[in-house]
């Protein structure tokens, strides 16, 4: 076994407890890393790898003052960082200075810096598996928000974690590998382990309303936070239980397909529904807006409550604009409260808190001035927190420094002892300021200066040419420079001691007073969190009102079953088009129109129309107004989509398999109150397979599910289903031919499309003319009823000499004696398995799935 120095042995002992993290080991002004940590960190951070002890121990380090930037880099890549500090004074230490890990920073526990997005929560999740389902707990350490839900299926757990963007998931070491793998891959999150779910006194207030299962799930998360953060978690709020049945369910694929919070291609906010809507003025409001989009309401009374407040704010333009200006000056109260509880709040944070509280009376008055009772009631609930404002006004200067060590935080008059020390310091400095003039007059040296530096303290500086003018015995030489000498006098030394003592006392007392002030502010955390909730709701509601007025949205109405949208518009496409004319479209469903079969050429707008209907429904159910001239909608409990064709690279599934899985998800879980969007189902396989599957799915949804369904297809043969299925109607996207080119009118009309215009689309894509002409010839032959297409390239002539073997033409097949085909063993097994199926007992979906599985075996 290798022999190490006591310091390296100390490092190894601490590292053994944090094997899944980089250990930032404090040595003087640096955080050092050793061994494998050093090798990996030097690559990830692109810093120099060195060594110690004769090259036997790899080593790298980062400066203490700039460590946060390096920590953020590692956290953004999914790593954890354990901060190990010196916890005793090196001057008084016997042997190796004592060190301890004071915090474990993980992707889910970031409290500050660039790793914390202003308008997004930073949730950490915990998942527990039970016999009858899964417990899910969520906590945002930066805001104090806590949520929990019991969820039946793992795919819904994944969808929820994806929605909130949790970067870390805490699980038990006993959770099965398959579930852990699914969570890690599907959620793309760091997995951490915690086995304690013990109830401790400080957590009782958080979990008092939870069931046993949710209590266990949240306490596992709480134990992990307590173990890693090693400080107060007093700002954590009582856990709010959310039931998936109380909000519209939108699965993971549908959230991506509809681009609710980020676009599919660039993964950016721009181009998403969130981007369109975000007119919030506070970070808190921005985060709440995202939560509302992720969880549309299904209770009509809650939807109407939001609608009513949006209507009020729309009706009072000037008051709304004043409200927006006031909200703009409110800082992030939730995260400020979190920093207070966490103990890392600085004086500028408290000044931001003070400036925010200054806006609250005006905001309350603005809302109360609105004539509607709902607005007055909301205003009456707002707590001004004026006692906290007065405390901060009395205690803090307006522009305090960033760090506590710089001092000058606490106002004069706040503490008598501090005033006394400051008077002593000021009097001493005034005396020194007068000293320069007195010494000049006394010595007759006009260039004499009184100065100060941290090494020698106060001094009197005289140029070397004038030193002979100084009175002997009165001045003591302190420092010699190239062209001057520096001296002190007994009086100067005495005053210096008084000033430095006063400043030391000021620094110590200011720190004590600030720490005490921080503890006083902690008492207000619950009130601040409630105020933050009220401000964020006002912000999200004014955001809806602002967008709705700016973009000419109308207030939707709700019905039991009817969809009646006049002049509906895709909200995001309309904004992106800006001043270009957007073609609105109607949508009528219900009363014999549960399924709309949409035909029309590529690029004509079928997918946009389908997404438009889903987004209008979501906007309506989050309480916003919608882009239409009139809208009556049912309340949808779920939205399912199958739009786009992208392989699932994470799980290695093909386009077609993803298509089938998404179709299965809709058909298994949709109800008659759901909305289903199927775009080009069946295109991932051969024509006849695809057409058969598409028809089977349409029939199954029509006969057994009853959900409102928009089904676009290129299979024009399916339009005959209108005469066979009572609730299905054909609609098409109108296009016209003009001088040999196709013009897309983007208008939805009743009936089926008369042709597909596929070759015209290829022409628009500027395929070579030879290909376009040849395709047109083939199409003409096929449309004439011919089952054979004349080859464009003639076959190469055969030679009569058998011994002269020539390369076959591309279209020629070498003739071979016909023999009875012999099946391979695996092919025979597939046929036998196919024969064993009882097709009469299978649903269309089960039959499709089995067929796909057999196809993969061949």
Swiss-Prot record:
GO molecular-function annotation terms? ATP binding; ATP-dependent DNA damage sensor activity; damaged DNA binding; mismatched DNA binding
Question: Which residues are noted in the entry as ATP-binding?
Answer: 600-607
Q: Which UniProt keywords apply?
A: ATP-binding, DNA damage, DNA repair, DNA-binding, Nucleotide-binding
Keyword Kinase assigned:
no
One GO cellular-component annotation of the UniProt record comes to:
cytosol
The family line of this record is: Belongs to the DNA mismatch repair MutS family.
Question: What PANTHER family would the database entry show?
Answer: DNA MISMATCH REPAIR PROTEIN MSH1, MITOCHONDRIAL, DNA MISMATCH REPAIR PROTEIN MUTS FAMILY MEMBER
- Write the protein's name: DNA mismatch repair protein MutS
Q: Where does this protein come from, organism-wise?
A: Bacillus pumilus (strain SAFR-032)
Q: Which gene encodes it?
A: mutS
